[in-house]
């Protein structure tokens, strides 16, 4: 599976002139093969096998979905530079966050800083939990001022620590299948 399109605003949003909010690890080249999220997916696969028993037919679909997700995570965020005038493409050996760090952007992690949490706790209890409430998807009203879902307390705290004004609003309905639907 080759991932061609991604709603970038679920993983990355510019929140000020030189500040970006992003999901940790995913958009950084140094984690392309060792992203902690890949390890969590391995654990999910192991737990799934244990729950389903030894019958390979029972977990074949699960294995292929997990492998596809892992490959997609490895492929997300690589930067291609296009030359002005010619349109010639050059694939860089960098992901989006790497390029922005070289340009002195402040990178603000969804879920806030890891602190003393283990990597697994940080991902499960903060990053993925708040990502479920669209923590990476804030709306910039103007540079340095964003609207964010109030449920994402760690992300909001990280934004404020970085000097971004946050206008929170209740969006608890997101937990129910990610928002209102017309059926």
Give the positions of each predicted feature.
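The feature marks the mature, well-folded catalytic cores of soluble enzymes
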Residues: 1-183
